[in-house]
């Protein structure tokens, strides 16, 4: 997706709105830490680190000095991240959401590793290049035969660490507002109040646009304290002791009250999963993405990395130099369900059989599926979301065979909304649907079987959630009007095949579209009518049910009053 432009500021605004409930007023905390640093930090050592970071090449001694200074900073601050690895499982996040998160973290991992690649042998760490350095370096590498013409590498400024353990560099970069403010005050010879005023104005500007070097120069005429900020383009891996524009903007964001700034988000173990879920929803709405091309992170990538690095604290502004690992190391995604508890022994020996379906029911399902022809056109449709389906149908028009079943929903509120605007199924009619039938059907489907569907996304998710990535889906992609050409005829001819769609369905009209039908959506009827569109006619003969009705529902529990 490297060719896609990123509307960075719009993304930031959307993230601010969507995550505003987790933003916190941090000005007082930041200034308390700033005062602690002004009192306890040895700024001669800070100056030494700053000089070291301006050199083109650094060694193990330089890294030791950097890490020692960051440890001192961490010990003086109260706003610091603590190591807290997070484990995400199916439950509060759906399997689909976990798969999306896992994919994004893997892409982010590839981007970061390509941006901070190891070159020239073990222990030589390189940051990124400016365009000028890139051009000159490419010419030299081509001259000596190391790089082929046309091989493009881009990034920030050349930074080489000639060290034995590159892993020690992890989490030693990035700015902290308390450090930025204290350095501006102490090293710039300014009062703390003047620095706060100048950075507050910079933060206010940030609520309307991304401040650039021109904006910085203009604000410096009003606030002389801002003149100590480096007049250079942002770099990827620079010390938090460097007074860069991005560091100043971050500090300013913390000083703006009521701005719901992303920089002020606070994460706790109890809120982590909800924040991640909300982030994925915002991502989908704004069509955000992870771009694996080396370079600066876009707003979504930046927030995702910071959230997943440490599960507690302020991911943007806290001291995190003592955190070990990267985002993809510290947020673990587990797709497997929790192991079943061992069976409880029964009195006369042995243990109860803990299965969802009785063996005879599962065997009947297996025989029904074996009656399908693997090579015939096979339609499939579901009602309800893929993570909570309430109806599923499989239909083969050549033989007129079909499998049709129901499932009681977990989310009753969402089910009632879907009933009103879509399928018209009443909860009381499927309350005693035998659990586990849909899963058993999917489990026993022949390997690599091909299905036809009108809209494949939900079916794909349903199959993937059951570990059936081998099943194939052909999406016919009819328009809404095309798909329902035979709707009235199908219901008139075959409504006796399904009596579970008794509810009233309300027309739902989206802006710019024709109002939907008020006929209920039945998975079986939909399969028959969609097939009819392709064949040009609806069959006269009655389709044949493969799954007996008596196994679709269980007997309701009875209460005996003594």
Curated annotation (Swiss-Prot):
Domain of life: Viruses
Protein name (Swiss-Prot/TrEMBL): Nucleoprotein
Membrane-spanning ranges: none
Site entry (Important for exonuclease activity), positions: 458
Function: Encapsidates the genome, protecting it from nucleases. The encapsidated genomic RNA is termed the nucleocapsid (NC). Serves as template for viral transcription and replication. The increased presence of protein N in host cell does not seem to trigger the switch from transcription to replication as observed in other negative strain RNA viruses.
UniProt keyword Endoplasmic reticulum, yes or no: no
GO MF terms, alphabetically ordered: hydrolase activity; metal ion binding; RNA binding
GO biological process entries: negative stranded viral RNA replication; RNA-templated viral transcription; symbiont-mediated suppression of host cytoplasmic pattern recognition receptor signaling pathway via inhibition of IKBKE activity
Keyword annotations of the record: Capsid protein, Helical capsid protein, Host cytoplasm, Host-virus interaction, Hydrolase, Inhibition of host IKBKE by virus, Inhibition of host innate immune response by virus, Inhibition of host RLR pathway by virus, Interferon antiviral system evasion, Manganese, Metal-binding, Ribonucleoprotein, RNA-binding, Viral immunoevasion, Viral nucleoprotein, Virion, Zinc
Quaternary context: Homomultimerizes to form the nucleocapsid. Binds to viral genomic RNA. Interacts with glycoprotein G2. Interacts with protein Z; this interaction probably directs the encapsidated genome to budding sites. Interacts with protein L; this interaction does not interfere with Z-L interaction. Interacts with host IKBKE (via Protein kinase domain); the interaction inhibits IKBKE kinase activity.
GO CC term (a single one): viral nucleocapsid
EC number: 3.1.13.-
SUPFAM superfamilies, per the entry: Ribonuclease H-like
Major location (coarse): virion
InterPro entries associated with the record: Nucleocapsid_arenaviridae (IPR000229), Nucleocapsid_C_arenaviridae (IPR035084), Nucleocapsid_C_sf (IPR038115), Nucleocapsid_N_arenaviridae (IPR035083), RNaseH-like_sf (IPR012337)
Domain notes: The N-terminal region is important for the cap-binding activity while the C-terminal region contains the 3'-5' exoribonuclease activity. A CCHE zinc binding site is present in the C-terminal region and may thus contribute to the substrate binding and/or the specificity of the exonuclease activity.
Family annotation (Pfam families): Arena_ncap_C (PF17290), Arena_nucleocap (PF00843)
Binding site for Zn(2+): 391, 498, 501, 522
Entry keyword annotation includes Phosphoprotein: no
Family the UniProt entry places it in: Belongs to the arenaviridae nucleocapsid protein family.
Annotated compartments: Virion; Host cytoplasm
């Amino acid at each position: 997706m490297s060719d896609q432009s990123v509307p960075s500021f719009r993304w930031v605004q959307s993230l601010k709105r969507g995550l505003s409930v987790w933003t916190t007023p941090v000005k007082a905390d930041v200034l308390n830490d700033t005062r602690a640093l002004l009192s306890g930090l040895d700024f001669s050592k800070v100056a030494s680190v700053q000089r070291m970071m301006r050199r083109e090449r650094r060694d193990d001694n330089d890294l030791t000095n950097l890490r020692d200074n960051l440890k001192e900073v961490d010990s003086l601050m109260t706003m610091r991240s603590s190591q807290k690895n997070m484990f995400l499982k199916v439950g509060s996040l759906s399997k689909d959401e976990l798969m999306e998160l896992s994919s994004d973290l893997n892409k982010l991992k590839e981007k970061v590793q390509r941006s901070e690649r190891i070159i020239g042998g073990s222990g030589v760490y390189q940051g990124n290049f400016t365009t000028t350095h890139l051009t000159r370096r490419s010419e030299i590498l081509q001259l000596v035969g190391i790089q082929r013409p046309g091989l493009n590498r881009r990034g920030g400024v050349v930074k080489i660490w000639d060290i034995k353990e590159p892993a020690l560099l992890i989490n030693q970069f990035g700015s902290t507002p308390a450090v930025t403010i204290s350095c501006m005050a102490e090293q710039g010879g300014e009062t703390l109040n003047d620095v706060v005023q100048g950075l507050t104005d910079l933060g206010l500007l940030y609520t309307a646009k991304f401040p650039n070097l021109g904006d910085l120069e203009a604000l410096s005429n009003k606030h002389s304290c801002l003149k100590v900020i480096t007049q250079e383009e942002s770099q990827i891996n620079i010390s938090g002791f460097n007074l860069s524009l991005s560091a100043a903007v971050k500090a300013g964001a913390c000083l703006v009250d009521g701005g719901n700034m992303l920089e002020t988000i606070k994460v706790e173990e109890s809120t982590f999963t909800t924040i991640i879920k909300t982030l994925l929803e915002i991502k989908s709405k704004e069509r955000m993405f992870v771009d694996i091309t080396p370079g600066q992170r876009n707003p979504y990538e930046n927030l995702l990395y910071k959230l997943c690095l440490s599960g507690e604290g302020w991911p943007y502004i806290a001291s995190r130099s003592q955190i070990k690992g990267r985002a993809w190391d510290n947020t673990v995604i587990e797709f497997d369900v929790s192991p079943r508890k061992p069976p409880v022994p029964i009195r006369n020996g042995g243990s109860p059989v803990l299965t969802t379906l009785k063996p005879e029911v599962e065997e009947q399902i297996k025989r029904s599926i074996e009656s399908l022809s693997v090579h015939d056109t096979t339609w499939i449709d579901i009602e309800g979301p893929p993570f909570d389906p309430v109806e599923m149908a499989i239909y083969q028009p050549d033989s007129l065979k079909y499998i049709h079943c129901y499932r009681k929903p977990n989310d009753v509120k969402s089910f009632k909304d879907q009933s009103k605007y879509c399928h018209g199924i009443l909860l009381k009619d499927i309350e005693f649907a035998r659990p586990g039938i849909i899963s058993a059907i999917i489990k026993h489907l022949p390997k690599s079987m091909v299905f036809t569907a009108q809209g494949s996304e939900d079916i794909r998710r349903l199959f993937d959630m059951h570990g059936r990535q081998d099943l194939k889906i052909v999406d016919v992609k009819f328009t809404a009007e095309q798909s329902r050409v035979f709707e009235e005829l199908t219901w008139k001819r075959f409504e006796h095949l399904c009596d579970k769609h008794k509810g009233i369905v309300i027309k739902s009209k989206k802006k710019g579209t024709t109002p939907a039908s008020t006929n209920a959506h039945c998975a079986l009827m939909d399969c028959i009518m969609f097939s009819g569109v392709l064949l040009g006619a609806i069959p006269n003969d009655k389709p044949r049910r493969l799954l007996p009705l008596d196994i679709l529902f269980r007997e309701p529990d009875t209460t005996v009053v003594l």
